[in-house]
A protein has these predicted regions:
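Amphipathic alpha-helical polymerization modules
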Residues: 1-133, 139-141, 146-271
Length: 271
């Protein structure tokens, strides 16, 4: 039985090493959130077992929990780069798939059609507003699109995004038009989000449905234009965890080796 106990320790340590390696590999990934491996002990016995005689039979990985603490904010100077200074996620919709995902990576750019999108072509979602900045009757989200030419025929000259998410388009004739406000999503339990890769997640039953609102409203943080949120990976902390996981793996391997030697001793006694 000691073989299987130590083998479970090897597998758990190997999983931990993989999670830490993934964190380290993404230390420079914009909007990345690290994960932590959580363990649970395994015990042999049932409800009728004598608690004084129950023994442990190993360990299992109970969860690989995502850590949504904020990463450092880095200034870029690009007005369409956005960082959330608090909770919340950007909502982005696939141009072809139509599927909505959620991200902390605010590296957006303007395409030839006037859409704000990320590097994969997913379009930033906004809520259309009236002249006073109030949401429309439906309050539904839509792709963020800036008219390249205004009603007077003037070309788009620039864009600004306020901390409350207000998107303003400036034109060559000096006119300024408020297009809408950036939509942010919050969740009852962000750790329940399913990672999709590329610093994106999708909602699940564990996370709860997305609650769409404006920056600075409810639990949502405000926006900082011209900045991006870096990965929340602390390399020093991960290196310490890596050493600990490596020693854990080596210790379990040694325990298997010791059990093997004991078994061989017993076999030798019988011969």
């Amino acid at each position: 039985m000691s073989f299987y106990t130590s083998l479970s320790g090897l597998r758990a340590a190997q999983t931990d090493l993989g999670v830490i390696a993934h964190n380290i590999a993404n230390a420079e990934t914009t909007g990345f959130k690290k994960s932590d491996t959580q363990f649970a002990d395994l015990v042999a016995g049932g409800a009728a077992s004598d608690p004084r005689m129950m023994k442990g039979i190993g360990v299992a990985v109970s969860a690989i929990a995502q850590n949504f603490t904020l990463g450092a904010v880095e200034q870029t100077g690009n007005v369409t780069d956005l960082a959330i200074t608090g909770d919340g996620f950007f909502a982005v919709r696939g141009g072809e798939s139509g599927q909505t995902a959620f991200t902390r990576n605010g590296a957006f750019m303007l395409d030839q059609g006037g859409f704000l999108h990320d590097g994969a072509g997913n379009r930033l979602q906004m809520i259309a507003t009236d002249g006073s900045g109030n949401p429309g009757a439906s309050g539904a989200t839509a792709d963020t699109r800036l008219p390249l030419v205004n009603a007077a025929g003037a070309d788009l000259a620039g864009v600004t995004i306020g901390k409350d998410g207000t998107i303003s388009a400036a034109y060559a004739d000096g006119a300024v038009t408020n297009v809408g406000r950036v939509a942010l999503a919050s969740f009852t339990s962000p750790v329940g989000l399913r990672p999709l890769g590329n610093s994106k997640w999708e909602a699940t039953g564990l996370s709860g449905a997305p609650q769409i609102g404006f920056p600075g409203a409810g639990r949502n943080g405000t926006l900082l234009s011209g900045a991006l949120e870096r990965s929340n990976v602390d390399l020093a902390e991960e290196m310490i965890g890596l050493i600990s996981a490596q020693r854990n793996f080596q210790a379990n391997a040694k325990a298997i080796d010791t059990a093997s030697q004991l078994s061989q001793t017993i076999i030798n006694l019988r011969t």
